[in-house]
Regions:
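Flexible, low-complexity segments enriched for small/polar residues
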Residues: 2-6, 10-23, 238, 242
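Low-complexity, intrinsically disordered regions enriched in charged/polar residues
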Residues: 4-8, 20, 31-35, 70, ...
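Short, compositionally biased low-complexity segments
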Residues: 7-17, 48-52, 63-66, 152-156, ...
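N-terminal accessory alpha/beta regions
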Residues: 21-121
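Active-site substrate-binding loop specific to GH73 endo-beta-N-acetylglucosaminidase modules
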Residues: 40-42, 56-57, 71-75, 107-244
Length: 244
């Protein structure tokens, strides 16, 4: 393969597995070799992370992306400057699929933490990603699972989990949906100590066993006293669920 084709192939790789790369850097990657670069992209933990001190220098009131404009600038800065492009690209991919917004969540730091979760788990199994999304305070609030109680279920999270995030319409029944919602009762959010007297409270996932429905549930042909993680275990074994 000619050097020009090598450059073109490497540029294509970085457009797909990242956000492009400066022309002068392509020469070094070509010299390293395509297969070696792919392995490097697939192991972001071997590359340095963005130092938050750089962001504090640019935004003295940074405080971990505490308002939407800084929240957005934080992420764009990381996309441009990361040494882990595939990790950042996967965070964007999962954010697009598991979309939440400050228009409802109204907690920019929590949205930033959710994006950080996508960075951490973006290259893991789909099961692990679904579990982390289900425990994400931003998603819990976005799809109202904090209002999903034993004896008074809210189906929003269960419906999105089955319809949009895994099986798709036609591959589950309304009874499956209701029983999935029952399995996620007690999965809620709890506020933590605020950053400062005027700041938003950080959130954390909280499981309230006293609010969980422990009754028998039938889900996709399986019967048992399922909790949320067991529902996800069943979902990821279904042929209709995409493989990642």
């Amino acid at each position: 393969m000619s050097h020009r084709k090598d450059i073109g192939l490497m540029a294509h790789l970085f457009r797909r597995a990242g956000f492009g790369v400066p022309r002068q850097d392509l020469e070094g990657y070509v010299a390293k070799g395509y297969e070696a670069v792919v392995e490097e992209l697939l192991h972001p933990e071997e590359q340095p992370v963005i130092n938050d001190e750089l962001l504090y220098r640019m935004f003295p009131g940074y405080e971990g992306a505490a308002a939407p404009p800084i929240n957005q600038a934080d992420w764009v800065f990381r996309m441009i400057n990361t040494k882990r492009p595939l990790e950042e690209k996967m965070a964007l991919f999962w954010h697009q699929l598991f979309a939440t917004s400050n228009s409802k969540v109204d907690n920019p730091p929590e949205l930033t933490r959710q994006i950080a979760m996508f960075r951490e788990y973006g290259l893991s199994t789909y099961r692990d990603i679904l579990i982390e999304v289900a425990k994400s305070p931003a998603m819990i609030f976005w799809l109202d699972n904090h209002g999903n109680h034993n004896g008074s279920i809210n189906e929003n999270w269960g419906r999105e989990l089955l319809e949009l995030f895994s099986l798709g319409v036609g591959n589950y029944s309304e009874d499956d949906l209701r029983n999935a919602a029952r399995a996620f009762t007690g999965w809620t959010v709890a506020p933590k100590i605020p950053r400062n007297p005027l700041g938003r409270f950080y959130w954390e996932f909280e499981y309230k066993p006293e609010d969980h429905d422990y009754g028998e549930k039938e889900f996709l042909g399986h019967t048992g006293n399922f909790d949320g993680e067991e529902i996800v275990d069943i979902i990821v074994t279904q042929p209709a669920t995409a493989r990642f």
